[in-house]
Regions:
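Catalytic core of soluble alpha/beta enzymes
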Residues: 1-49, 76-85
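Flexible C-terminal active-site loop/helix
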Residues: 6, 43-104
């Protein structure tokens, strides 16, 4: 909130692994009310966490920049399914429930 009050940022970068989904949505609402642009980023997340971020971005539609890199070591990925990535786009399956991930 201090960032918004002091006007010291043009963008806020939201990362679900640092805030969680509900807090990310709160941050987005505060930023939008102050006309601060939003971007979403990630760290080394599983398909499940990445799927949550992709769904949030698609559902909210308020992000100017999206930096959601796929898992860099697919052999260590604990989940199957989730959003399909074909640079620079993610595709969500209309046929799978929820995030669309299952445990390997």
């Amino acid at each position: 909130i201090n960032v918004v009050r002091t006007g010291c940022a043009d963008y806020i970068n939201i990362k679900l692994m640092k805030s969680g989904i509900i807090e990310a949505m709160d941050i987005a609402a505060i930023a939008r009310s102050a006309n601060i642009k939003l971007m979403v980023g990630c760290m080394l997340e599983s398909k499940l966490a990445l799927g949550c971020a992709v769904h949030m971005v698609a559902g909210m539609g308020c992000f100017s920049h999206v930096d959601l890199d796929p898992h860099s070591e697919p052999e260590k990925e604990p989940f199957a399914g989730g959003p399909d990535y074909s640079a620079p786009f993610y595709t969500l399956s209309p046929d799978l429930p929820g995030i669309g991930c299952t445990r390997k």
